[in-house]
């Protein structure tokens, strides 16, 4: 729903301000705009080779945006994947995220529930909209979110080690600005 999205987007932008940068999350005026963006973002992820369920349709019903994605049989969200599997495959998540960033994309809402494991493959879902001209900040924010997702499961050292397989130390250090804000989010 667009109103809920607007409130959450405002909160994220306030968090970005508190981290010393301008807000970089876009908001949508209607539920349809919101799901059309997610449809397009999912298509773009797939075009660059990042696993994401194939988008089928986006529409509005009773004031709610509905995005229909391909069915992934027997998937687990990252919350339900064992710590051992996460530790073994954490570098893959950073490789996927790095691929987004290398192609001028960002996830913007990387949480455990937006990372799926299906048939041995990781998938990203629920990408949000960020300003195209803020690549450094959105990369740092995505990295902070990924580290916040992984750290409680595999520990800080293993999470950072996995991140170094895909990112330069200077890029990783830029994520520090967002760690306090990301820790405050109720979903991390």
Which role does the model predict for each range below?
Residues 27-29, 83-84, 133:
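Short, contiguous strand/loop micro-motifs
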């Amino acid at each position: 729903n667009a109103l809920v999205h607007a409130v959450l987007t405002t909160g994220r932008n306030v968090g970005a301000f508190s981290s010393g940068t301008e807000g970089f999350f876009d908001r949508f005026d209607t539920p349809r705009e919101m799901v059309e963006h997610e449809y397009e973002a999912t298509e773009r992820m797939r075009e660059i080779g990042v696993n994401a369920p194939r988008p089928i349709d986006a529409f509005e019903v009773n004031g709610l945006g509905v995005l229909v994605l391909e069915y992934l049989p027997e998937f687990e969200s990252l919350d339900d994947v064992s710590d051992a599997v996460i530790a073994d495959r954490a570098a893959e998540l950073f490789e996927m995220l790095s691929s987004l960033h290398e192609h001028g994309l960002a996830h913007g809402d990387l949480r455990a529930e937006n990372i799926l494991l299906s048939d041995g493959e990781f998938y990203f879902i629920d990408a949000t909209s960020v300003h195209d001209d803020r690549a450094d900040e959105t990369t740092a924010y995505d990295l902070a979110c990924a580290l916040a997702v992984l750290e409680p499961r595999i520990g800080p050292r293993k999470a950072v080690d996995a991140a170094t397989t895909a990112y330069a130390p200077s890029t990783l250090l830029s994520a520090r600005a967002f760690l306090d804000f990301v820790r405050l989010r109720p979903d991390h």
